[in-house]
Amino acid sequence: MGVAADLKVVASLVRGMDRDRHSTHAERIQRFYAPQAAAYDQFRERLLHGRQALIAALPCAPGDHIVELGSGTGRNLLFFDDRLAHAARADLVDLCPALLEVAHERHAHRPNVRVFLGDATRYRPVHPVDCVYFSYALSMIPDWQAAISNALRMLKPGGTLGVVDFHLPEGMRQPARAFLRRWFGHDGVRLSDEHPRFLRERLDTVSFSTLRGPIPYLPLIRAPYYLFIGRKRVADPAQ
């Protein structure tokens, strides 16, 4: 692929996600990602930092049922390496058919991987699961609180929720916050400083860190992101 593929992705980013109020969120997502689906992973490898670190830290054991909400192309499952083969089942859930086509092709030979077209705020497996994670998905979900609540409802007591995503860290100056909100918002990414606080209020925190990573073709800007791993409380009537 190379530079030509990058240019296709950059062109989509420059155009941005449309704001057609007569379209659903799922329709806007499909229109935005379909033209760049084939080159999606190559570009995002240099933009979506911390995914491998998050998955390496998830305490998934053989026989576990894993769910990724907002899975896109299913690239993140490969970060599990040998652990994936020993999982009882891994569900990939996304709203975008174009990205899920890539996921289908990538994991067609894995009998324990299932791909679902679905909403992260509503998808629910029949039985409780051991681990749920979001990788750069919460910031794309309008009702991200509902997505987190849904993840908690599908988790077993003591189960693990992991998140890696862009955010606005505490203490960031207002001009920088305004620029990043506008720049990311052009492509449908809703930057917030509320995700970590919401997560810590609802789970027992196992680990939390904030970092910054480079953005392709923008050498002077480093995007802030966070990694969170939490454990569902064993006795919580709200969950």
Locate predicted features.
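Conserved class I S-adenosyl-L-methionine
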Residues: G2-C60, R75-F79, P175-F179
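C-terminal alpha-helical "lid/dimerization" subdomain adjacent to the S-adenosyl-L-methionine
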Residues: D20-S23, E27, F43, G162-I221
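Class I SAM-dependent methyltransferase SAM/SAH-binding core
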Residues: H65-R122
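Helix-to-beta-strand junctions that scaffold the AdoMet/dcAdoMet cofactor pocket
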Residues: A85, I141-P142, L155-K156
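A short acidic, Gly/Pro-enriched loop at the edge of an enzyme's catalytic core
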Residues: T121-V132
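A short SAM/SAH-binding and catalytic strip from SAM-dependent methyltransferases
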Residues: C131-D143
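A short glycine-rich, Lys/Arg-flanked "PGG" loop and its adjoining helix->strand segment in the class I
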Residues: Q145-P157
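C-terminal lobe and adjacent flexible extensions of AdoMet/dcAdoMet transferase-like proteins
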Residues: F228-Q239
